[in-house]
Every structure is written in structure tokens, then in C-alpha cells.
Amino acid sequence: MLRKPLGLAIALALLAGCAAQQSPQTPPAHTLIAPEAASGWQEKQGWQGHDFMVAAANPLAVEAGYQMIQAGGSAVDAAIAVQLVLTLVEPQSSGIGGGSLMLVWDGKQVAAVDGRETAPTAATDQLFMKDGKPMAFYDGVVGGRSVGAPGTVRALALAHQRYGKLPWASLFEPAITLAEQGFVISPRLAALLTKDPYLAKDPDARAYFYQADGSPRAAGSRLTNPALAKVLRTLASEGPDAFYRGPLAEAMVAKVHAHPTNPGVLSAVDLASYRAKLRDGLCFDYRQSRVCGFPSPSSGTIALGQIFGMLESRDMAALKPVQGEQGQPAASAEAIHLYSEAARLAFADRNQYVADSDYVAVPVSGLLDKHYLARRGALIGERSMGLANAGTPPLAPARGQDATPELPSTSHISIVDKAGMAVSMTSSIEDGFGSRLMVNGYLLNNQLTDFSFTSLDAAGLPVANRVEPGKRPRSSMSPLLVFDKSSGELEMSLGSPGGSAIINYVGKTLLGTQDWGLNLQQAINLPNFGSRNGPTELEAGRTPTAVVEALKAKGHEVVLSEQTSGLQGVQRNAGGWLGAADPRREGIAKGK
């Protein structure tokens, strides 16, 4: 029924070239992992809509979501269409071969749809050990060893069952049209193809992403994906079971096991038994707002709740932004100092206590206890504490420290529909291009490397985030929905890619909107900053020199880097809804 208007809309978007108008201790190694390469700064002022808004990482994906809402669909319908298009046009970041965390507000409650990948039943705590030692990180990433059972397709189906309005099959039409007729390779995808040293080693990926002479396909060239179109047609007509059983599942398992040097243990049983989970949202209060996010296996909301619990007693509003390098606002040295010290303490606790709560006892209430956070916050002094130690929250078990790297190839979607339903969804295949295994036109994840490579820490204590069969690896994905604490009215949908730096990207944005009176786009535009219990990380080229020097004077070990977040969000304002997208990437928003 919807094929003609949706196909026409996508074709028009393609013809228009996708142009959119915008209205001193040694740190843990994981803190030094840089986000995906930058796309260059593209100035964005935000997009205004009265009735609804869609924000995502690629204009074609945004257009797909926009058309779904125009056709009478819900925010969840739109999010599904957006994610399917992202599988095609932003394959390095997310897709049906990966996992997702989706928050949904239906006007009554916040539900958390957990599509995080799971470890195979044959996985053991020795999965990433070699000769008694943890293997080199990328030796674990590249190949079948790192592939977990993908969860996104099941999660999308569960969300649609509960919140969808349009027929399931219609949600696939924009992605199928683009896969069959072709899409234009974006500058970001082209740049990442040029820089990746592993992807071309996979024959299927090489044939798709590279030319006959081995050079990557250039930005602006058109690419079709008939293999993915066929998969999407199958899922549209047969439903999610077709992904987890039968030929499509068998192809995934065969690909994982066939890697010549690093085969994996994913089985047909692992895929057939995968289930998405419906959880309750996890919320905390800050200033006049109630901030709701994802519970375990995400660590993001717990960490943010701790950070802002420690900052609640500080007069952050008085620490107004200063003038940045390009004359735009930037956080002051004192604001960065207080935030980064709180983040060190939160990350220390995160690394010790947070993992899949279906497998380990996570002391959530203790970690967010106001008295505990007051004691932790009292550790913040005038000078940087350097490397923070984990605390002992109420009901905390004895756990070992985990320094698992978490790589930043992820995407975020924020949508509010005409009825006020809101979605905040972060999805990922983990590293850029995931495991570098391509099957049937899409890439498989490497999410198992989000587990700790070791099961015991140096003191012999068990690591909460160790590999166990069927377990979901800890994530930092932090999709948020923010509400007015008094009225209960939705204020914002917000999130970002960026690996474990997601927590600080989202935290910076909350400071901007909740303490400094910035609108969502202005807060996203602020130079990024934070700490992951290593150095204090600042955005190169945009952080004022005076701020850098002031932080060094306070004892901070400062690292300047690109800090390429990919924040997307929607914020209520006087005119309806403000859509916001990160100038550091290619995202846009569109509403009406």
C-alpha cells in the first residue's frame, strides 16, 4: 500500500543529492582509544518542527523515518525504517548484524527494549586468552571469534509488536528501494574505508566496498546492494524468525566458522534461541528534570546518575561557558574539572561493578544512593585526583577491575511522533565495520570484545564483565529520555555513538541544557570534554588554550583529540520540537 509514495520520496531524496537545510598516573589503555574519524565540522543550527521530529546519522535514514510518520506511523515505526536504512548507508556503525538499545515513551511509561548481542553457548572465559595471556585486542576483534548473536532484528520486531501502527513489511520499503536502486557513498563512509586496514581481507566486503584494483569506492559514487535487498525482502515477508532460523542463520554461522585464522563459536542454536528483552527504564533526578535511560547491560545511565548525583550539590549554573577558539561557547576550566573528577569516580565504579544483571548482582541502588554519592563527591578537590579507585557502595559484592576497551562504531536515533510517543535508540556493531565479516550484504558485529578478556583481575577477584555463555556484554550506550520532574512532560530524546566516551558526550550535553540554559543544538555544539578514569580528554582545535593550561595547573593530564561524537536529539520548545544533530558527523533532523 505504501510502496509508491515511499519509493518516490526516496528517489527524490537521492536525486536531490541528500542535501538537507538546517533551520599523572598511567591511564588505562581503553581511555586512549579514539572515536571514529571526523567528517569535518558542518555548522548546524537545529531544525524546527511543530508536530514531530526525526533525528539520525544520515539524511536518507532521516527521510525514511519522516515518510513513515507522514504515512501515519508511530515513532517506533519510524525508528525501524531509519535503522534498516542505516544498515545500508552507514554500515560501519550499526545494522541488522549488530545490537541495539531502544527506549520508548508511550505517554505512560518508559520501556527499554534490549537487543544487545549474547555470547554463544560454547563461549568460555578463555575466549580471548592465548598462551595464558589476553590476546592482542585486534587479534580478538577481526574474525569470527568476536561475533555475538545479533539482537537488533528481534528487538525491532518486539518494539513493533507493542508500539507499531504501520504494517511490518512497509517499514522495509525505503531500505529495499535504496539497496536496489543505489545510494551515494557519503564522505564519512569513504574516509573510513580508506583508513581501515582489515576490511578488504574479507572477500565479500572487498567485492562490495572496493574496486577491482583494491582502492576503496570513492565518496559520491553510487552503490547498490542486491544481497541486502534480498535479505530485507525476506524479513519483510516472513518476519524476524527468518533471520534467526533457516538459510540466513546458516549463512551467518558458516561465515563465523569459516574465518581462516580466527574462527568463532556462534551456532545455529545460539541464533534460534536469541530473544530480545523488555526491561524497565532506569531513572535519576537532576535539577528540575527526571532523566531516564537504559538499565544493565548498559552502564551509561548508572554512570551518568553517579556523575550528576555528585554534581547536584555544586553550583554548575554559575560556571557559565567561556568564549571558545572559534568564538563559540566552551566549558570553563572549573566546570570541566568538576565534571571530569566526578566521571573518574563513576568510571572506577562502572569498571568494577556493572555487567549483565541477569548473570551478576549489580548494586544499582547502592551505586545511585545519595549518601554514597555525597561521600564520593567529597573526594573531589581543587586538584585532579588522577586515577580514581572504585568505592564500596551499599550491597556491593567483591569484584575485580575491568579495563575492557569499548570501541565507538555506533549510531543514535531520536524521534518524537505526532502523538507524543518518543524513541531514543542507540545501535551498534561495535568497532568500525565490526568483525570485518560480511554476509548477505551486511556486516557482523564484534560485540564479544566488549567483555573483559580476563576473568580475574590482578588481585584474583572475579571480573563482573567476564565472558559467560548467553551473557550480554556490558555497554556504554546511553539513550536518554528527559522529563520535567514536576509535570512529567517529555523534554528531550538524546544519545550518541562513541564507545565508552558516549557517557561524557551525553553528560556534556545535559550540563549544557540543564545548567547553562543552552538549547539542545547549542549544547551538542559545545566542545567535548571528560575523563574515563584516565587522562582528561578535550576536543582538539575547539578547546580554549587558557582552559587547557588552567586544567594542567590543577594537575590534570590533558589529552587533546578529535572527540568526534555523533549526538542526535529532539527537544521540546515553544514552537513544538527542535531537532538537533552533531556538527562533527553527517546527521540531520527533519520534522513538520
Question: What residues fall within each predicted segment?
Answer:
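Short, small/polar residue-rich loop motifs at catalytic or cofactor-binding pockets
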Residues: L278, L407-T410, S475-M477
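Internal maturation/activation junctions in enzymes
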Residues: L32, M316-S428, L437, D582
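C-terminal motif of bacterial Sec signal peptides marking the signal peptidase cleavage site
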Residues: L15-G17
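Bacterial N-terminal signal peptides that target proteins for export
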Residues: M1-L8
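Extended C-terminal subregions enriched in glycine
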Residues: G470-R472, V506, D515-E562
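Active-site rim segments in enzyme catalytic domains, especially the processed small/beta chain
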Residues: L88-G95, L101-W105, Q109-A112, N262-S267, ...
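Bacterial signal peptide processing site
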Residues: A19-Q21
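Noncatalytic scaffold domains of N-terminal-nucleophile
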Residues: S23-E63, Q67, A75-R245, E250-P295, ...
